Amino acid sequence: LSREPEEQRVTLGDTLKVKIPISGKGPYSFKVKKDDQSLPDSDRVRVQEFDDYILVTIPDVERDDAGKYSINVANDSGSCNVPLKVKVIAPPLPPTGPLEISNVGKDHATLSWKPPKDDGGSRVAGYIVERRDTSKGPDAWIPVTQACKETTFTVPSLLDGHEYEFRVLAFNENGTSEPLRSSSPVVAKLPFSMKEKYRK
């Protein structure tokens, strides 16, 4: 082995090719591990032998291809392990649900969620929160904020008595996730106890 490869960053869906120079006499045999688990010969990671290098290929990279690899290269003289770290660059996964709705009033509601399980190789920069008045149609999503930094947000300016759905999207420098949606719509209204208070 002439050198150790650095961390490889590859965009989701692209093909990763890593050329690793070697010195010695073939033929060589290869065994691949990912995160300390042996991968079968028929797995997605392909290792090809050339005169003075080996070529590691992962086609159509998926999120699950990210991780730490170890490639054991062996010939009649001995063996060595080549470490290879793969980072998949992609938009984050959706925020982790459920999307909880609390503190519902006649003109507001508070949303809470958890961060995505996969940030796509880059830090989550924030969240986009959207609302939909169900009386306006299935595509009437309106952004409430495009720069929420926390995993909770109080949606303002709801209309008393109207029914709403909500959704939250995560974003990073690579793009925007699919949305996490509320499981069912809620009606903006005063809680029953507050209505009784105002009647008295």
Which ranges hold each PLM region?
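Conserved aromatic anchor
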Residues: 107-122, 200
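Extracellular Ig-like/FN3 beta-sandwich strand-entry sites
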Residues: 15, 25-27, 64-68, 79, ...
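Flexible inter-domain hinge/linker segments at boundaries of tandem extracellular adhesion modules
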Residues: 1-5, 34-41, 48-53, 75-77, ...
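Extracellular beta-strand/loop-rich beta-sandwich domains predominantly from IgSF
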Residues: 7-9, 43-64, 68-77, 117-118, ...
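Acidic, Ser/Thr
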Residues: 20-25, 74, 114-120, 132
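Beta-strand-rich modules
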Residues: 155-176
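Solvent-exposed loop segments of extracellular immunoglobulin-like
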Residues: 26-33, 109, 123-127
